[in-house]
Amino acid sequence: MTERKMCKFYNLNVPERRSGSGEGGAQNHGGNDDDERNADEIVQPYVPPHEHKLEYSYWMWFSRRPPARELSATTTGYGQALRLVGRVASVEQWWGLYTHLARPAELPPLSDLHLFKLGIKPMWEDPANVNGGKWVVRLRKAQTGRAWEDLCMAMLGEQFMVGPELCGVVLSVRFQEDHLAVWHRTASDLAAAARVRDALRRILQLPASVPIEYKAHGDRLRASNRQNDEEGRS
């Protein structure tokens, strides 16, 4: 897909990719040993003058949890299972990263891809997420590939129109269907939550009959803490 086609979704006035730019612009920002070692560091990607800078910088994470039957007391925690794929700050860097990513249909079940603003980790406990929530839509697998691409491009292009309120988007590959989620900062801001929901429905062209579920991170954290307390007493 060309950058011009991407502009249809998020209104960037970007010319066709020129020779010498594009994928090469993201080579130093994809998943590599430096990213693995410095995953907690807020490293701002360098944007050369000829590239088209995004409003925000982003990082992409991958995680995969084992099936329930394989879970044990020694299973790696969620935070440790997150693997940094790369960081992007321009249109060219994004396409350089995206063209090397596995498509949803190629990912095994229980895999997740997380595209978040740089500095925000895809965890409930992150300070930017702890008071927020997410909208979740369930899709047939045949719909997921296009919907995930549209969702990423809409986030990069500020099509949700809520500015810093938006934290990230998540693809969750499951056995029978897939889930897409949009995370935002403030669950108590009902107006902001409604704007995110309405934008999600518009971006994915979801009919009114398709349900979108809301989950507040605080509720999930409290439930998780209760479960941990019960396990500690058992």
Where are the regions a protein language model picked out?
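ADP-ribose/nucleotidyl-moiety interaction motifs
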Residues: 2-234
